[in-house]
Amino acid sequence: DDFESLYPDIFRSSNITRCKLQMMRTSPQPERWRLGPTVAAGLTLRHYDSFRNCKSLSAYSNRIAKESPEFDQWGIHVLASQNGAGEILIGDSHEYDWQPSIFDQPIIDKLILNYLKSFLVVPCLEITQRWHGVYAKLPRQSEFVAYPDTEVTIVNGVGGAGMTTAFGLAEETFNQ
């Protein structure tokens, strides 16, 4: 939002949109139960570009589009990870819109949980918290970079891979 306010012309020409995602968190799992590494399943293969060379991805994507179009409608793929308190974080969905709704869609949470149950058994799936986030997304590009002034560099739109790429991109930008 600062980018949009401070440099509206550059922002409008950037093609950045917004992505809203819905997430959930369970109550803590029984004491010694641990999930281990983050768990993902087939829908996640369709979401991240890292998997685009997977030979069966096209056939799988076509099957999902035909049999479960609601996953595409809401941009759903499912990840589950456990925090130090034993809670399972579950998500997420992807609604691309310049003005995403402030209201969450209960059907999205239901679809995510039903899909999660199809490949993961968790002792306690009692959902104690639900939230959504909104981030900047640059379709078909990894980041937007502009230099509106000699002392200003704008880097934005890394949403979707920001937690993975942000530190490397920051280092690259500062070293220029």
List where the protein language model places each region:
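C-terminal catalytic lobe of FAD-dependent flavoproteins
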Residues: 74-77, 82-89, 95-176
